[in-house]
Amino acid sequence: MNWGRPLLTLCVTLGALPAFGQSPDPVLRVCSDPQNLPFSNRAGEGFENRIAQELARDLGKTVEYTWFPQRMGFVRNTLRKKDDATGKFACDVIIGVPAGYELTATTKPYMRSIYALVHAGRKDLDSLDTADDLLKLPPEQLHKLRIGVFAGSPGADWLLRNQLLEQAVNFPRQSGDPAVNPASVIEHEMAAGNIDVAIVWGPIAGYLAREHSSSAAWHVIPFSPDPQIRFDYPIAMGVRFGEKEWKDTLDCWIDSHQEKIQGILREYGVPLLDETAKPL
């Protein structure tokens, strides 16, 4: 049974949908990156695209995107961009932002994930069950590894804490080329033999493993929550400040569609945690 519309009817009863859910506007306008898998792309192949489609269907709308690379200026050029002639904003929701993000109001989180180690099925790393097992490798093996990491990330902090910075292969968090994204960087560098293992955001690690499942299977090893270095983050949807009714609409939808959302995320291999940071 499809519970989407009955649950949205309940949202209406509770007063959550008057501004957007019952609007005559037939379009759900989504702010998104055109080339940033596993999150989104123009072909609609990312999990954020899938979530947006589910949301639009339940609201009786179709999805329309405003595209801009996910980097500095993203919110200004999408969610906050207003047409002076029509008074309309370019788009009305960002599907994935950190909960509590300072540039937008945020819904309740719809997922929590964690950073992970990923390697391209190396036999000499098969013994790793946890990220900290990397530190237990024989010194002559450990100190030969080249570890890919993005500057300013928790992975960089972890390497610093464990005196492994000399082995780090650092990548900038943002590239000047909008066609380059973190997943493509790690995939290219791993294939070229420039790195042996990488520390990346969990959804990226899971996606890379899924993409290579038919060849040399990539291995994903999530970090454990750490009191000193934050590896896990809740992810929410971002809306404009002051649009309480729209935020309430999305909160209600998220509450009633957790199972569906988690199903989509699992298809992409996203490491998921519950509210207490325990693996799901």
Labelled PLM ranges:
Residues 7-18:
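Bacterial N-terminal signal peptides
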Residues 53, 65-141, 221-230:
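Acidic, polar ligand-binding/catalytic clefts
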Residues 34-37, 44-57, 117-181, 203-204:
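Bilobed "Venus flytrap"/periplasmic-binding protein-like clamshell domains
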Residues 33-36, 112-116, 124-125, 210-254, ...:
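Periplasmic-binding protein-like
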Residues 47, 51, 241-264:
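Short amphipathic alpha-helical coupling segments at ligand-binding clamshell hinges
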